[in-house]
């Protein structure tokens, strides 16, 4: 007999979020809701929020990794806005992407113009040539 009933005693499969199905940490459902509520388009496909969530997660991981390296270079264990600024501005692609972004409490990149550096004296150059 073919019917709707399955085997007796078999447990129903637990529901799995779209984030878990895609192997992501960021919430796909929330991104989908924000895309729908934002009036970006009349209709939003099912793959669009998954792809966008994956891109956002990748960018966040990339920035956090570089900021963590900057914090470690400064012998700190906590990432502060200064570390985010250094990480973004020292990376060519992230700097191009976030070129117009101002990071509060980020400071500026250390840079001294070559004309402002002290000139080598004649004595220092002669002494180095003799050795």
Curated annotation (Swiss-Prot):
Cross-link (Glycyl lysine isopeptide (Lys-Gly) (interchain with G-Cter in SUMO)), chain numbering: 126
The UniProt record lists the keyword Ubl conjugation: yes
Subcellular location: Nucleus; Chromosome
GO cellular component terms given for this protein: nucleosome; nucleus
Post-translational modifications: Phosphorylated to form H2AS128ph (gamma-H2A) in response to DNA double-strand breaks (DSBs) generated by exogenous genotoxic agents and by stalled replication forks. Phosphorylation is dependent on the DNA damage checkpoint kinases MEC1/ATR and TEL1/ATM, spreads on either side of a detected DSB site and may mark the surrounding chromatin for recruitment of proteins required for DNA damage signaling and repair. Sumoylation on Lys-126 may lead to transcriptional repression.
GO molecular function list: DNA binding; protein heterodimerization activity; structural constituent of chromatin
One of the GO BP terms on file: heterochromatin formation
Modified residues (N-acetylserine): 2
Residue numbers carrying Phosphoserine: 128
Residues annotated with N5-methylglutamine modification: 105
Motif [ST]-Q motif, residue numbers: 128-129
Keywords: Acetylation, Chromosome, DNA damage, DNA repair, DNA-binding, Isopeptide bond, Methylation, Nucleosome core, Nucleus, Phosphoprotein, Ubl conjugation
Annotated site, Not ubiquitinated, chain positions: 119
Modified residues (N6-acetyllysine): 4, 7
Oligomeric and partner information: The nucleosome is a histone octamer containing two molecules each of H2A, H2B, H3 and H4 assembled in one H3-H4 heterotetramer and two H2A-H2B heterodimers. The octamer wraps approximately 147 bp of DNA.
Functional description taken from the UniProt entry: Core component of nucleosome which plays a central role in DNA double strand break (DSB) repair. Nucleosomes wrap and compact DNA into chromatin, limiting DNA accessibility to the cellular machineries which require DNA as a template. Histones thereby play a central role in transcription regulation, DNA repair, DNA replication and chromosomal stability. DNA accessibility is regulated via a complex set of post-translational modifications of histones, also called histone code, and nucleosome remodeling.
Family indicated by similarity: Belongs to the histone H2A family.
Matches recorded under PANTHER family: HISTONE H2A
Domains (record comment): The [ST]-Q motif constitutes a recognition sequence for kinases from the PI3/PI4-kinase family.
Note: In contrast to vertebrates and insects, its C-terminus is not monoubiquitinated.
Protein name per its UniProtKB record: Histone H2A.1
